């Protein structure tokens, strides 16, 4: 009888410990290697280009940064704006720039109100030489 009580207490203690570790792991924030210098982009109607500063926060590994524009429904678009360069390598701990350039079709947008687009920046990690490694590409999406 005493062994059964101790086993139940042990199982209860281990279950509580596992639950606490799981909850603690869920609460850990994900840190992006590629950081953007702002939370939104204001593209005034008379501007031709807007420069965004990005930086690789990882001090050991280079990352690729891929940028594109989406409309308000989340569809990837090629006009009236384009991202230059669409893909670039950012060295460890170094800054870089991404430019959003307006195309001639931008002149057809309404000038008396805002039009919503989204700027997306995806970080692509370098290929790992270790077997059985899970790599995650984080993406930042901000209003434009």
Question: What name fits each language-model region?
Answer:
Residues 31-55:
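Beta-sheet-dominated interaction scaffolds and their linkers
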Residues 58-75:
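Short acidic, flexible loop segments centered on an aromatic residue
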Residues 27-29:
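N-terminal signal peptide c-region/cleavage motif recognized by signal peptidases
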Residues 105-144:
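Terminal connector regions
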């Amino acid at each position: 009888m005493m062994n059964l009580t101790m086993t139940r207490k042990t199982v209860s203690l281990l279950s509580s410990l596992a639950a606490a570790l799981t909850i603690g792991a869920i609460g850990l924030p994900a840190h992006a290697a590629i950081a953007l210098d702002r939370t939104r982009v204001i593209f005034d109607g008379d501007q031709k280009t807007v420069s965004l500063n990005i930086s690789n926060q990882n001090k050991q590994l280079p990352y690729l940064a891929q940028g594109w524009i989406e409309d308000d429904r989340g569809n990837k678009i090629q006009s009236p704006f384009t991202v230059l360069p669409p893909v670039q390598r950012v060295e460890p701990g170094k800054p870089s720039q991404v430019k959003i350039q307006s195309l001639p079709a931008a002149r057809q947008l309404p000038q008396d109100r805002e039009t919503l687009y989204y700027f997306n920046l995806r970080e692509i990690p370098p290929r790992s030489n270790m077997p059985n490694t899970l790599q995650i590409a984080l993406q930042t999406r901000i209003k434009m």
